[in-house]
Amino acid sequence: MLKVFLVEDESIVREGLKKNIPWQEYGYQFMGEASDGEMALPMIRKIRPDVLITDIKMPFMDGLALSQIVTQ
């Protein structure tokens, strides 16, 4: 199973994605979530997910900056 981590600042969207996608049915394991890139980064470094789903516009650290740091 591939490990998935979700980063989204809108709690309604984050909860909707987390609860309405049958992750295991598609071969994914939902590993965690964060509301912005700054909060997500230490969690991502610890969990080391295979897939990162992130919003682009977020406070503190946006999804583009987060993706750039994670891929370095």
PLM regions with names:
Residues 58:
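Receiver (REC) domain active-site loop signature in two-component systems and cognate sites
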Residues 55:
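Active-site residues of response regulator receiver
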Residues 36-39, 62-65:
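Acidic catalytic/metal-coordinating carboxylates
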Residues 7-8, 34, 52:
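Conserved sequence signature across two-component system core domains
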Residues 10-32:
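Two-component/phosphorelay signaling modules centered on CheY-like receiver
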Residues 1-3:
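Non-catalytic signal-transmission and effector/linker regions of two-component phosphorelay proteins
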Residues 45-48, 69-72:
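Conserved phosphotransfer cores of two-component systems
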Residues 15, 41-42:
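Alpha-helical elements of the RecA-like P-loop NTPase motor core of helicases
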